[in-house]
């Protein structure tokens, strides 16, 4: 299995493997056209982020975002593209958290949805990926 296929598999586990998770009486599995579009956008981008996760350049941050953890591991000519991917991913993640809270009828839950997803992303990260833990970054 190549890195892109492995990354796509893990993205599906991370994004869609949230079955049974709930926030209070909320539904993290709720589906709206906006949520579906965000998930599709994130899944398509993940094939490009996968090698960055695998190399350790990008890690899963404790706040539910992705972060450029080690810029020196990305060739200078590719850093702009890496930063653009990270920015797009983080914009979609923020929109996803907001939309899930809104779709549950509780926009005030956005920060709780973010915290729940942040922990799930980290818990389900592939071995070898970097995750932010209390005290700093660690390799899973």
Model-predicted segments: where are they?
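Terminal, compositionally biased segments
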Residues: 12-13, 140
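Sec/Tat signal peptide C-region and signal peptidase I cleavage site
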Residues: 20-24
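Anionic, Ser/Thr-rich low-complexity intrinsically disordered regions
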Residues: 25-140
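Bacterial N-terminal signal peptides that target proteins for export
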Residues: 2-11
């Amino acid at each position: 299995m190549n890195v892109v296929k492995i990354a796509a598999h893990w993205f599906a586990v991370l994004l869609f493997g949230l079955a049974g998770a709930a926030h209070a009486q909320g539904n993290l599995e709720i589906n709206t056209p906006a949520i579906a579009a965000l998930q599709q956008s994130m899944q398509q981008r993940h094939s490009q982020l996968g090698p960055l996760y695998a190399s350790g350049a990008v890690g899963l941050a404790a706040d539910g975002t992705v972060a450029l953890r080690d810029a020196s591991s990305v060739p200078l000519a590719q850093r702009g593209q890496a930063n653009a991917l990270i920015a797009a991913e983080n914009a979609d993640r923020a929109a996803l958290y907001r939309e899930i809270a809104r779709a549950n009828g509780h926009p005030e839950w956005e920060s709780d949805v973010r915290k729940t997803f942040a922990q799930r992303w980290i818990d389900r990260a592939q071995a070898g990926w970097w995750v932010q833990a209390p005290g700093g970054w660690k390799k899973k």
